[in-house]
Amino acid sequence: MEEFNDVYDKDRNLTGRLHLRGTPWKPGEYGLVVCVWVYDGKGNILLTRRVPEKSFAGTWENSGGAAKAGETSLQAIARELFEETGIRAGEEEFQLLDRGRDSFTHYDYYCLKRDTPLGDIVLLPGETDDVQWASFSKIHRLIAQKKICRVIAGQFLRQEQTLRRLQDTKP
């Protein structure tokens, strides 16, 4: 089944055009990718491991992905989190941490406080094959061992101080 994404301009305005997933982006066209750091309030971050068949095989990451055509950023992150972990969250529960842009993509980085037992996580076949709650020090060890997807490692290092502050606050 073909999947389409909305096309944005560099200033994040919708253009009204659609992009077929898996095809090259044209100059001046941008998609939207969303990511979420799920934290438990006890100093841990939820990570999932990519299956061997995917790029960055066997590395750990946070949940996220591309927004589908017609989705808002919040709709996309709620869908991605549920698809990849089985965790349901209302759009109002997500907190926007940061936004970014590269050559063809706008990024929205969210966080969500949720203390979900690992046994309740439902992994998405073909996407992820393991899950863990990782402390900040463990995440740093995984980064040093190159066991966290490099893009995700960069995100974590940029957003670490904010994530640490959030761990110390009550809902």
Question: What is each of the regions a protein language model found here?
Answer:
Residues 66-151:
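Unchanged
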